[in-house]
From Swiss-Prot:
Its main location: cytoplasm. This is GTPase Obg. GO terms for biological process: ribosome biogenesis. It comes from the Bacteria. One of its GO terms (molecular function) is GTPase activity. Keywords: Cytoplasm, GTP-binding, Hydrolase, Magnesium, Metal-binding, Nucleotide-binding. SUPFAM superfamilies: Obg GTP-binding protein N-terminal domain (SSF82051), P-loop containing nucleoside triphosphate hydrolases (SSF52540). Coiled coil: none annotated. Its cofactor is Mg(2+). It is an enzyme of class 3 (hydrolase). The keyword GTP-binding applies. It comes from Chlorobium phaeobacteroides (strain DSM 266 / SMG 266 / 2430). Monomer.
């Protein structure tokens, strides 16, 4: 199953400035020749790969990018100032196509790699360029050329930063729906989630991470029971594991340990990943709920219904995600089954 983030934006490079119609006006020079300067170039638009970016989420909030036009030429042969260039930063590995022709424009894979995608219009020539022996006082200049404009279609194979692990009905789908814009199927019965759902969690502007709601695990998953190996293959690709146990579980500590044991049976290396334990559904927790003591693992208690603890969880997830190197990510591009 391929997980692809996509966005479409409009870009408009700046138009070139007009050339100037002007004549020298100096003392003792009653009939000065043409001295109109050229217009400035319109601003270019560049794409730049940035390894700190993980998703295309910010392009859902800003859809248009307009570079400024070049300034018009002036007298005394002064050329107008060039328009300001725009640099649009995108995650490494983003495929960029012309939305109309679907032609591949860019595939920037290295951090800092840049590409010019829309050229600003050339500035028009001033009237100084049009003087001839028979026409010594030309009264016209060129307009600036239009900047390039089109729509860009961007696609990015997502890297899962955070994997949600838990038995069916632990509240994984509900959590991902309140932290992100994902709309997974949610119902009060086991195995509602049959394929991984991905949600993009926006932490701050230009800061986001990807959360994978993995299908519910059951005891024996490492041997292939339930969704078994289909589930565990996707867990391998995440950087941080969040182990969820519902507050109404019969024995929270035992359920947590069972989940950890299933991970260890499949691949003991999974236990080397950063891990957070989360007790969900605190809105229905009983007064005599026993909070387990988990050595070496941060434990948070949340309610996706009331919002209790969600900010603390989001802060902790971002803290851990931002310390992990994105260079070790693997695209989520395998098929289930």
């Amino acid at each position: 199953m391929k997980f692809v983030d996509s966005a479409t934006i409009s870009i408009q490079a700046g138009d070139g400035g007009r050339g100037c119609v002007s004549f020298r006006r100096e003392k003792f020079v009653p009939k000065g020749g043409p001295d109109g300067g050229d217009g400035g170039r319109g601003g270019h638009i560049y794409l730049r790969a940035n390894k700190q970016l993980a998703t295309l989420l910010d392009f859902r909030y800003r859809k248009q990018y307009l570079a400024t036009r070049g300034a018009h030429g002036q007298g005394s042969r002064k050329t107008g100032k060039d328009g300001s260039d725009i640099v649009i930063e995108i995650p490494c590995g983003t495929l960029v196509k012309n939305a109309q022709t679907h032609e591949l424009i860019a595939d920037l894979t290295e951090d800092g790699q840049e590409m010019l995608v829309a050229r600003g219009g050339k500035g028009g020539r001033g009237n100084q360029h049009f003087a001839t022996p028979t026409r010594q006082a030309p009264r016209y200049a060129e307009p600036g050329l239009k900047g390039e404009a089109f729509e860009l279609e961007m696609e990015l194979k997502l890297m899962a930063d955070v994997g949600l692990v838990g038995f069916p009905n632990a509240g994984k789908s509900t959590l991902i729906s309140v932290l992100s814009a994902a709309k997974p199927k949610i119902a009060d019965y086991p195995f509602t989630t049959l394929v991984p759902n991905l949600g993009i969690v926006r932490y701050e502007e230009y800061k986001s991470f990807v959360m994978a709601d993995i299908p519910g695990i059951i005891e024996g998953a490492a041997e292939g029971k339930g969704l078994g190996l289909q589930f565990l293959r996707h867990i391998e690709r995440t950087k941080i594991l969040v182990v969820l146990v519902a507050a109404d579980a019969a024995d929270i500590a035992l359920e947590y340990q069972t989940l950890v044991q299933e991970l260890e049976k499949f691949d003991s290396g999974l236990l080397l990943k950063p891990r957070i334990a989360v007790i969900t559904k605190m809105d229905i927790a009983s007064e005599d709920m026993v909070v387990p003591e988990l050595e070496g693992v941060k434990l948070l208690m949340i309610s996706s219904v009331t919002g209790k603890g969600l900010k603390e969880l989001k802060d902790e997830l971002w803290r851990q995600v931002s310390t992990c190197s994105r260079s070790e990510d693997q695209p989520l591009d395998e098929h289930l089954g």
